[in-house]
Amino acid sequence: MWKIGQRGVPYFQRLIAAPFTTLRSLPTSLVETGQNRVIDASLTLIRERAKLKGELVRLIGGAKATTALLGVPLGHNSSFLEGPALAPPHVREAIWCGSTNSTTEEGKELKDPRVLSDVGDIPVQEIREMGVDDDRLMKVVSESVKLVMEEEPLRPLVIGGDHSISYPVVRAVSEKLGGPVDILHLDAHPDIYDRFEGNYYSHASSFARIMEGGYARRLLQVGIRSINKEGREQGKRFGVEQYEMRTFSKDRQMLENLKLGEGVKGVYISIDVDCLDPGFAHGVSHFEPGGLSFRDVLNILHNLQGDLVGADVVEYNPQRDTADDMTAMVAAKFVRELAAKMSK
């Protein structure tokens, strides 16, 4: 397993420094051709996987909505540690590790491809090694999500990766469906800075980008316990409904009986694993004590009324997990229950 330094510069970032240096010495036209080929190959891979899974689900029949698992191993927009880039394979392994059965709490069988199908990962690192910038990389993520959604009845459930991926995913869902969605965002942080540390695509700025783009009508943020003046001002600017942990006992009944998505294109759920108290999830980059319990989150998810059209689970950091990968199991459980909620 790769190790990360005190400020979160992972070993693999040093490994790709040499290719970037080499690229700068090549003619621009040659570099652009190489970038186009890698991006085209990535999109073709996602397209063909989605087609295969979509055809299988349609052949079996009886599904109105099927959860399609898509990994986005992106971590360089994190402000601290970049370990979330390593998360997707750990979460997949935990889903199917055999230590628990494959039936969700709502009684759905994950081995049924009509409930959960997997279309693989976007090869983020390979794309970045070609010198592709974040503007274009985010478009690749959005286009990949749209390719999945083209294969009805597939709906995207994305494994991050840091929270910056939520912006291109929500953008794709909204654009593909033709209008805004309502978002339930569970997190210790509001992630709504205009530009955190100057980074337009920072994981701490993803929901500012979403709201600026008009991709959400309502944004409900639950579990917040690390928020400053800018976070509150940005929340007011965009009309965000921010529910902080200090008032959770008062808000609990309402949050466990949410009804979202009426009058818009559906509901999107974004779960940052650090919404949980660190006692329930040690494998995150930012420890924020005083968070939600795992059952708190499941009660909110299970009782939510609305058509779930997309979701993500982000910010699991395998580099900070316990020796027995307990937080991987936590992230996997989120994926399992979201898949049950989305499929029908």
Swiss-Prot record:
Induction: By methyl jasmonate and infection with the fungal pathogen B.cinerea. Mn(2+) 1 binds at residues 163, 187, 191, 272. One of its GO terms (biological process) is urea cycle. It catalyses: L-arginine + H2O = urea + L-ornithine; agmatine + H2O = urea + putrescine. GO terms for molecular function: agmatinase activity; arginase activity; cobalt ion binding. Its main location: mitochondrion. Its cofactor is Mn(2+). Mn(2+) 2 binds at residues 187, 189, 272, 274. SUPFAM superfamilies: Arginase/deacetylase. Disruption phenotype: Increased formation of lateral and adventitious roots and increased production of NO in roots. Substrate binds at residues 189-193, 197-199, 228, 315. Residues 1-26 form a transit peptide. Binds 2 manganese ions per subunit. Disulfide bonds: none annotated. Pathway: Nitrogen metabolism; urea cycle; L-ornithine and urea from L-arginine: step 1/1; Amine and polyamine biosynthesis; putrescine biosynthesis via agmatine pathway; putrescine from agmatine: step 1/1. It is an enzyme of class 3 (hydrolase). Its EC number is 3.5.3.1, 3.5.3.11. Belongs to the arginase family. Plants over-expressing ARGAH2 have decreased susceptibility to the fungal pathogen B.cinerea. PANTHER family: ARGINASE 2, CHLOROPLASTIC_MITOCHONDRIAL, ARGINASE/AGMATINASE. Catalyzes the hydrolysis of L-arginine to urea and L-ornithine. The latter can be utilized in the urea cycle or as a precursor for the synthesis of both polyamines and proline. Possesses agmatinase activity. Catalyzes the formation of putrescine from agmatine. This is Arginase 2, chloroplastic/mitochondrial. It comes from Arabidopsis thaliana.
